[in-house]
Amino acid sequence: MVSNSSPTSSRFSSLRSMLQKRWPAALLMLGLILFPFIFGRITGSPVTEGAPKFWQGQLIVVFIFAVYAMSYDLLIGYTGILTFGHAAFFGGGAYAMALFLTHVAPDFTDAYDIVIGGLEITGVVMLIIGTLLSLITAILLGLLFSAVSVRVKGHYFAMITLAMAEAVNILSKATDFVEWTGADEGLHGVPVPMWINPTQNRLTFYYIALVFAVLMYLFARRVVDSPTGKIFVAIRENESRVRMIGYNPAAYRTAAFVVSSVIAGLAGGLYSLWTVSATPTMTGVGTTIDALLMTLMGGIGTLTGPMLGAAVLEIFGHFFYQWFGARWPLVFGLIFIALVIFLPYGIVGTWRLRSDQWKRAWQRFRKPREAAAD
């Protein structure tokens, strides 16, 4: 029997199927791309001033912390590794970028820079080198943490990672390196090229942060959907079985740490450019707790869940601070408890598990009402 379907119709059907699955993501991307202009139109303010500029800044923070939380999910959600030292990767990347631009990179202010097509070429090169240093620093820290995970597991490992992260935090505050790191005060006024300056060219920074978030998500998605990602999940479910079928769990845990640390370190490097600073707070346990909260709110083992959790924490945190002042963490804590009770798998995780059940319940609810209306 000969099939009547042509290759062209097959391609169109596969494209249609892909669009049906991906249209929410495409719509979200379109909305984020147009957001500065739409919001400027609504408020009647220029895109580079007032409320549009402020909310660009809020979303920049969301993009960066969405990537950071997603990197944490690769460990706790996909590989089953609970760590309290994730801030070391984020802060390490931030300090690597800030230290290089402040103390090592040549002066790339207007007087010394080469400008071609509106881009400061020296500044671009320095940013690339700083990014590579953030990446290398994150890899080294990831290898260090993974070396410990070979010998210690479970809650003991979580406590050791907390101690290791605290060591990084103490190092960042050490007065022995005050001329380099600023000790408790941190580094401030990190030189940033004019074309990416978050104050004077925030719209450019907004789109760079958006592209960064998309690329990091695609990279993480590629990893978790790959055979290596399947081994990550298998280690989470039953490490002994993974070892029995011939795989080396230690090697895959190391890979998970390196991938996670690289993503977190790059997010930290971008955050140092956004804040034009690097401070001990970035390496503190509070920054790790932020990633944990974002992941739990959005849904462990989902990638998109932690990104949504970052948006909820940052945006609602802003409004709660406006409404409740210094008491906003208490209010947010109560809401978080309610989320854990009613959405035990996080927003995205619970939706994936129970959306069909909720849809069927809604249909059963609508049928009697529609029949009565007829």
Model-assigned labels for residue ranges:
Residues V2-D374:
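Transmembrane alpha-helices and adjacent helix-loop boundaries
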